C-alpha cells in the first residue's frame, strides 16, 4: 500500500517546556484543532488527552512521552509529548533523539526557568531546530518582550519574533503576523477560538510592527545571500521568500522564531500549527542520522527513504494493560510491515513484529505498514529495550546509543506483605526496562531491595506505580544520597600477593600509579608494562581487580570515581601466577594506595531555583545558608524574588514542606542535579561513622 502522506509533508515534533508553562494545554488544543479530540480536556480537571497515566491526572504534570499523530492542512504531525518536570529529564532527552523539530513553550509571566535551560541544552546537544511559543498571554504580568530578552540572555539563542501580541493580560486580542503584516484577531464568542479574522494592523501598533518586521527580515536574510542583496537594494521581499528564509535559518539553528498566544483561551494555536508546517523540517530536511556497522565498526549514514533497507530506533517502552508491551519506535528508513521479522542489532537477536499501532494519544489505530520518517508503536517485541536499534538483517546497523545519567538518590523498598516479594521484583524489573535512569539493586549486606533514580519525585512516582499498576503496596526507607569517593594526591603503590602452602601457590606482584583526574573524567587504565614483566594475559585481571575494589570504596564504601591507573611494573612466577592472584594484587594495591592519596567523599550538588515574595527573602536565604548552600544570583521578576543557589542534595530532603511553611505556601522551587563536590571534613566524618555504625 503506498504511503498516504509524502515524506516532505511529515513533521516529527516535540513540545517541550517548564512545568506549568502550559505545555499539555497547548498539545491538547493542537489535537483539538486538528480534529482528533472532540472535547477539550483541561489539565486542572484532569482530563487532558495526552496525560493518560492516572498519577498525571492527579498531579497535573505530564510524565510519559506519549506519541500522537494528527493532521493539519494535509500534513501529518507526529507529536511527542515531553515531560517538563526535572526528575524526568531522561524522558526529554530520549524524545529529543527522535524529533526533527520542537516547539518550546514559555510562560509569558515566568519566562525562562531552570528546567527550560536544561531542556534547551538537550535540544542543542541533538541539534533540534525549534520555534518558541510564548503562552499564557492572558495572565496578569504577561510580557512577551521580557521573554524575548530572557531567551537571548539566558539561553543565548537568537530569538526572532515573527508575531507580536495585540494587547496583553485581559486585553490580549490576538497577534500581528509580521510575515503577512496582518492582524489576526480571535472572536471571543466563537466556539473555542475556532474562528479568527485577518484585519488591518491597529494604528497604535503599526510603528512597532514595522520595527519588528525590519528586525525579523534582517535576521533571516543573513542566511541567504541572494535575498540579502535584494533586501539591501531596497526591493520588497515576497511572503514566500521571507518564509523560506525563516525556514532555512530555523533548520540551521541560527534563529528561533517566536510566536505567542494563550492556549487556555484558544488564541494563537492555529498560527502555531501553520508555523510548525512552514518552518520546522521534514525528516529529509535534517542531517541524516548516523549509525555504526556492528561487524566492521564503520560509520553509516541513514538515508530517510522508503526504498532503503529498514532502520528504526526504539525510544520508549510502555506496558499496556490490553496489548502488553508497546515499543515506541522512530522509523528512519525503509518500511516495516506487521508480521515481518527484523533484527535487533544492539542485542543481535531476531524479533517478530506483531501488530503496528498508530497512537492518537489514548486511542489507537492498527496499521499494516509504517514508512520512513514516521513514529509508531510495535506490539510483540520480546528482547527490545529503550535505545535499541531495529533494522533489516541484510544491513545491520546500530544507531547511536543514548547516554543515560547515573542516579543521584536511592531508597530501600520492601513490600508490606512478604507474599508480595516476588511480585514486587517482577514489577520493578518491568519499570527498569521502561526507564533507563531508574535502577534496581540488592544491598548485599542487608539483603534489601534498593531503587535509585533522578530525584525524590521520580522515586515517589515509581512507588506509586507499583501500587496502582502492579497492586504491590510498599514501605520505603529514608532516601539515601549517592555519594562518591575520590582522592587528591598522586601516589605509587606496590603490592605482592604470594601464598605458598604446599602444592600450587598463588603469586601476583604489581606496581601501580594512582592519578586523580578532573571531575567527570571517569576511570582510565593505562598499561605501561615493558618487556613482559607481567604477561599479557594477566593485565586485564589487574584492571578488573582495581575496578571491583573501586566499586566498594575505601573510606565509606562508596564508588571511587575520576582517576587514572598506570600499571608500570611487577613480576610473576611461572607456576604459581594466575589471573586470580593478579586480580587480588591489583585490588589490594588500589586499596592501600588510595588510603595514602588523601581520599575524600564527594556529594551531589543540586542547582536550585526558588521563587518567593520579597518579604520572605531573608528567611529563605538564611535557610539556604544553614543547608550549606551557596546563593549564586538573585533577580526581580514582577515583584517576586528569584534566587539561584547550589545546595547539597543531602540537605534538600523534605524541602518543599519547609519552604511552604517559611513562605505560607507562596514559595515555589525546582532543582536539577548539577555536579559533584567534596564534602566538608566534619560531615565526611559523620557519613563514615554512620556507614560503619
UniProtKB/Swiss-Prot annotation:
Q: Which gene encodes it?
A: fusA
- Domain tr-type G: start-end pairs: 8-284
Q: Native species of this protein?
A: Nautilia profundicola (strain ATCC BAA-1463 / DSM 18972 / AmH)
Listed binding positions for GTP are: 17-24, 81-85, 135-138
The UniProt entry, under CDD domains, shows:
EF-G, EFG_III, EFG_mtEFG1_IV, EFG_mtEFG_C, EFG_mtEFG_II
Report keywords, A-Z.
Cytoplasm, Elongation factor, GTP-binding, Nucleotide-binding, Protein biosynthesis
Cellular compartment(s): Cytoplasm
> Which NCBIfam families does the protein's record reference?
EF-G, PRK12740.1-3, PRK12740.1-5, PRK13351.1-1, small_GTP
Question: Mind telling me which residue stretches traverse the membrane in this protein?
Answer: none
A GO CC annotation recorded here is: cytoplasm
Where it mainly occurs, coarsely classed, is cytoplasm
GO process terms (BP): ribosome disassembly
The organism's taxonomic lineage, starting at the top: Bacteria, Pseudomonadati, Campylobacterota, Epsilonproteobacteria, Nautiliales
**What protein am I looking at?**
Elongation factor G
